[in-house]
């Protein structure tokens, strides 16, 4: 067995499981076992050539507050004997959209509105750039963000190792996954780009081919991680091309997730959401223009900067979108931003992304310093104001 593919359907109370089996022989069977911990809750013997749909009774749903994972064991039987066996896991969770009582589209988790809020996370490290020094260091960031009261991470222009997403699955952290950009050059005609005022990059045949190949590979490789709920094909017009075609292909390839076709501008009428970037203060797309058809999200804002002497990448020329001299002033400003987000949620905002988890080289606008030695604002203070966002009801 070389791979599996798991697709939950909480409305039908089923999990669809397909298994790629090489060198199948006549009479081979797959024994699929679904376990709650070590207790078998469903078992089925099936033909290796077909996907199998298994019904679960009284299934437990996965969410940030209750990240329950079912264990999965698949055994290849030949003449009644085991010739191969693998273990994996899956979650029963659904990400979708639907109108609230006011007709505004809301992002739904397991058919209920859950405001999604988290940092822009580039996953940079001073000693390894895109490579964390250890697994413990990598998951440290996720742990701290959870303690700060965030329920989502936008993984920005980077794909992490599988262990990263596995940890998000286990700990109940939602993930928006970006496609790493290439071919800089095209711009939107107005900032932040709006519908019907967009430009696209004319990429070479080779460049376009690499994009399609790599985006396909990313989606295939990460498909089984339930924490991933949004795919982001393009960001701020960077290398953006054939937006409608790429977005609709992405939606067709994975209808189980939402698609943020163009985060931050260069919008086309495709995908599930319209995504505004605004610095430093929060803003939102107009609900009266877009809200009845698209999810309204704030894909980037904030960037409040605080340099910590002895923990900056460079001594001079550090920057934030707005800089402060002490943590108290920074937090006070941040708290005003979360209060504004509460107002936006009532108007129809479904998600927001703050810039960002850590300082990144010359950018000193992280919650933590680049070396992770200093958390700039007390975790409990951040959690207090962040938690309020999840209590704001939709109409």
Task: State what each model feature region is.
Residues 1-167, 171-175, 214, 229-230, ...:
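Secreted/periplasmic carbohydrate-active enzymes, especially glycoside hydrolases
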Residues 142-144, 152-380, 385:
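Substrate-binding/catalytic cleft of secreted carbohydrate-active enzymes
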């Amino acid at each position: 067995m070389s791979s599996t593919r798991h697709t939950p359907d909480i409305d039908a109370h089923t999990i669809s499981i397909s298994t790629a089996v090489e060198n199948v022989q006549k009479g081979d069977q797959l024994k699929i076992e679904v376990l709650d911990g070590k207790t078998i809750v469903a078992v089925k013997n099936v033909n290796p050539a077909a996907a199998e749909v298994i019904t679960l009774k009284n299934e437990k749903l996965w969410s940030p507050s209750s990240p329950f994972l079912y264990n999965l064991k698949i055994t290849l039987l030949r003449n009644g004997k085991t010739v191969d066996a693998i273990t994996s896991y899956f979650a029963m969770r659904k990400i979708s959209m639907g109108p609230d009582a006011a007709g505004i589209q809301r992002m739904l988790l397991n058919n209920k509105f859950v405001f999604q809020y988290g940092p822009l996370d580039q996953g940079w490290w001073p000693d390894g750039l895109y490579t964390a020094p250890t697994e413990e260091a990598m998951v440290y960031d996720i742990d701290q963000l959870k303690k700060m009261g965030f329920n989502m991470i936008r993984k920005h222009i980077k794909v992490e190792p599988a262990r990263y997403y596995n940890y998000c699955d286990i700990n109940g952290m939602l993930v928006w996954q970006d496609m790493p950009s290439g071919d800089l050059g095209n711009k939107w005609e107005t900032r932040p780009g709006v519908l019907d005022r967009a430009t696209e990059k004319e990429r070479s045949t080779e460049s376009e081919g690499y994009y399609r190949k790599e985006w396909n590979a990313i989606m295939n490789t990460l498909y089984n991680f339930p924490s991933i709920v949004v795919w982001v094909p393009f960001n701020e017009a960077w290398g953006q091309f054939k937006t409608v075609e790429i977005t609709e292909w992405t939606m067709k390839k994975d209808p189980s997730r939402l698609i943020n076709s163009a985060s931050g501008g260069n919008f086309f009428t495709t995908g599930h959401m319209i995504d505004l970037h605004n610095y430093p203060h929060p803003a939102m797309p107009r609900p009266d223009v877009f809200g009845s058809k698209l999810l309204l999200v704030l894909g980037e804002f904030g960037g409040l900067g605080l340099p910590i002497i002895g923990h900056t990448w460079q001594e001079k020329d550090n920057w934030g979108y707005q800089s402060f001299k002490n943590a108290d002033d920074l937090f006070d400003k941040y708290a005003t931003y979360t209060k504004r987000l509460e107002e936006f949620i009532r108007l129809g905002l479904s998600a927001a992304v703050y810039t960002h988890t850590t300082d990144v080289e010359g950018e000193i606008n992280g919650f933590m310093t680049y070396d992770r030695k200093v958390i700039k604002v007390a975790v409990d203070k951040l959690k207090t104001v962040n938690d309020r966002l999840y209590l704001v009801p939709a109409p």
